[in-house]
Amino acid sequence: MMTETIRGDDLEQYRYCARCGEHLTQKLLDGRVRPVCLSCGNVVYLNPLPAVAAVLIQNGRVLLIRRGVDPGAGLWALPSGFMEQGETPESAICREVFEETGIKCSPGKLISATTHDDHVFGHVLVLAYSVACEIRDATAVAGDDAVEAHWYDTTSLPCLAFDTHRDIIRQAEVLYSMEHHEIL
């Protein structure tokens, strides 16, 4: 049976029970060390944070943003971010693309569901979708936590903030070529 190791700093943030306020104890449950309240029995499950990443490819170029904040400040990334309470992945994708590029879009197909261990946010579940611009050849204008937006040739990508984004772009290219029976 495979178990994941949880970083000590992940467990350290859970010192008191959210239900009763008593101190939490680290206990091995189901093959994992988990914060547990011995007073009321509450178990804290350390679940991944859901995030979305958008892949807009037009004419062999992919839309990237230069991040203005950590993690990865100054590096390039797909338009992406965390889902908000009450959002679907599809609505989160459209919101993130608009906030970071000013482009209105509609969600396409799910390209990938992968995980990423981030030094700031911990374990992140990344849902990547293809998206279609509502206006062909739309001009991207950086906004929100993006300081720049640019279309890059998929064969010459800049240094990306997240390895998962490079993998997602490659997966999108493969799916596109399979759907259109062509080699990119």
Give the role of each language-model region.
Residues L56, L64, V131-C133, W151:
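Conserved hydrophobic "DFG−1" position in protein kinase catalytic cores
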Residues E4-R7, I57-E99:
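Conserved Nudix-box catalytic region and its N-terminal flanking loop in Nudix hydrolases
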Residues T114-A138:
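Active-site-adjacent beta-strand/loop module that shapes the phosphate/pyrophosphate-binding cleft
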Residues M1-Q13, T155, C159, Q171-E179, ...:
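A broadly conserved sequence feature marking short terminus-proximal activation segments
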Residues V141-A172:
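NUDIX/MutT-family hydrolases
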Residues S39-L63, F82, A113:
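Conserved N-terminal beta-strand and adjoining loop/helix that marks the start
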Residues I6-A53:
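Acidic, metal-coordinating catalytic segment for phosphate/diphosphate chemistry
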Residues K27-L28, K104-S112:
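A short coil-to-beta-strand element that immediately follows conserved catalytic motifs
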